Amino acid sequence: MWGGNKSIGRVSTAIYIALEAGHPNACFLGDVYHTYKGGSDFDALKMLGPQALQVFHWNDYPSNPPREKIGDGDRVYPGDGVAPISDIVKGFLQVGATPVLSLELFNKKYWAMPPLEAARIGIEKMKASVALAL
């Protein structure tokens, strides 16, 4: 899914493509930011199960800029924005999904940090954001 793309910017279109692929291992690569950017409701993820939800890009987004203007570089560490992170995790668990969470950030402020520090903070923020939902 790619939130800014008209062809594959919503959960529904990405799932449609995976279904139409007809491959037994086809799945959905979700992303917190792209779900928001594309205008999908996070509750749509509850319609998917473990087969479709194997990996999910984990990040957050601020309240400003608005959806129409937000860009990849505006992503922030999980828990530092306004995304419904706890609800997303609870939704995964409701459908029996335990996807691998992959931190994906394109924030130049983080890129300017020493790599190990950025990674350490990222792992801590990921763990904390999931723990709040459990």
Regions picked out by a protein language model, each given a short descriptive name:
Residues M1-N5:
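Active-site-proximal beta-alpha loop/turn segments in soluble metabolic enzymes
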Residues I8-G30, H34-L134:
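Histidine-acidic metal/acid-base catalytic patches
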